[in-house]
A protein has these predicted regions:
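Non-cysteine beta-strand/loop elements that form the S-adenosyl-L-methionine
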Residues: 1-10, 67-68
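Alpha/beta catalytic cores of nucleotide-metabolism and tRNA/nucleoside-modifying enzymes
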Residues: 21-44, 48-172
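Glycine-rich, proline-tolerant flexible connector loops at the mouths of alpha/beta enzymes
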Residues: 11-19, 74-75
Length: 172
């Protein structure tokens, strides 16, 4: 194979891990795949919600990332306010492409659009560039060699996001 798509059940509308009892956290899957054969390109799929997730996936060994829900829900040229979003293993998707449904491993829903493609892509680009700079990396190879990993607790995750508004303020 020229490339391997890593991660089962990590997508925002996927229930494969719950239905089948199979799958690992996305970052662990990327680590495992990247260690096996570096002649094969690694595609990270599922669980990418922020530019920071992209940087972590690339640092773990991914050569590419898929950004399903992150990019899927951007402004439509049709001017609609909601868009159908569904997993490829959802009942609706199975009926469309197989004309029958086995046990669904995903859901379908209508989700509000998030904004313009240009704004989101500029934000992602800025976050990725910043992530590389914090690592001291000028390219993907340097990122993967210079990265230092540590475990983060749930308290550390809460501290990492904005949190003043939940205590005593209203976000502007």
């Amino acid at each position: 194979a020229d490339a391997v798509r890593c991660n089962i059940g990590g997508g925002s509308i996927c229930s494969t891990r719950l239905v089948t009892g199979h799958g690992l956290p996305g970052l662990q899957t990327i680590f495992d795949c990247a260690r096996t054969d570096r002649d094969v390109k690694i595609i990270a799929d599922g669980g990418i919600k922020t530019s920071g997730d992209i940087v972590k996936a690339l640092a773990a060994g991914a050569d590419f990332v898929m950004c399903g829900s992150l990019l899927e829900l951007l402004t439509s040229a049709r001017g609609e306010k909601f868009k159908e979003y569904r997993g490829m293993a959802s009942k609706d998707a199975q009926m469309e492409w197989r004309h029958k449904s086995s046990t669904p491993e995903g859901v379908a829903s209508y989700i509000p659009y998030k904004g313009s493609v240009l704004d989101i892509l500029q934000d992602l680009e800025g976050g990725i560039k910043s992530g590389f700079s914090y690592t001291g990396a000028r390219n993907l190879t340097e990122l993967q060699h210079k990265v230092e990993w540590s475990r983060q607790t749930p308290a550390g995750t809460r501290e990492s996001s904005t949190h003043i508004f939940s205590q005593n303020g209203v976000q502007k």
